[in-house]
Amino acid sequence: MAGTTVDDVIDGVPLVLRSYYDSFKRHGVEIPMSTLNEMRGRDKREVINMLGGEKAPAIYRDFVSMLEENLTKVKEISGASEVFRWLKKHDVRIAVESGFPALVTRDIVKHLHWLENGLIDYWTCSEIVEEERPSPAMIRRAMRHLHIRDPSEVVKVDDTTIGIEEGHNSKSLTIAVLTGTQRREKLEAAKPDAVLNSIRELPGWLEEMHLA
């Protein structure tokens, strides 16, 4: 979600990166922002367990608190709702997924009114499926919920290489978008089916590929 359909940049820094950095630093663990950026798209608890050592439980509690304190400041990526409406008009089922904790993911979706306004059909996260990307577990869970059997009918859109790998592992079509913090060259190395500037270009790509 963050970087693909959710704009989590607050005061020039993505909320997830700032929350990572500050929660680690509070416990005397210095992690370069560049290292944290490489972890985008991964399950947040797993990242903190990997980098935080014995301090990980306390760091994770602070991390979640920082996210929750700032959730009302996040907004959707420009044009996301319009794209969702276009997809709905063309009978496309929509699921969003995240590496955020379940309660945080739920609260972001609620804050943006996506479910209540009928803009998406389903949400899930790595904590719910108990597997992190690049496992295709979140995609497969969404497919089951939305009664989709053929993964070739799924288009996975993501702003991270690990998200694109997740799409490959599910045998779905994959689209990288440049609205996150990972560079085009890095995303292209993951071999997505297309690289778009943002989700706003998705309808045009689907029409060009005769998929809508």
Region annotations inferred by a language model:
Residues 112-125, 186-206:
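Structural recognition of alpha->loop->beta junctions
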Residues 31-35, 116-122, 150-154:
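Short acidic capping loops at alpha-helix termini that bridge into adjacent secondary structure
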Residues 133-164:
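Conserved Lys-Pro-Asp/Glu-containing loop-to-beta segment of HAD-superfamily phosphomonoesterases
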Residues 25, 47-50, 81, 85-95, ...:
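Substrate-recognition/cap helix-loop segment adjacent to the acidic, metal-dependent catalytic center
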Residues 46-85, 90:
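Metal-dependent phosphoesterase signature
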Residues 5, 76, 94-97, 131, ...:
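Conserved SAM-binding loop
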Residues 1-36:
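Active-site neighborhood of HAD-like aspartate-dependent phosphohydrolases
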Residues 155-194:
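Acidic, Mg2+-coordinating phosphoryl-transfer loop and its flanking beta/alpha structural elements
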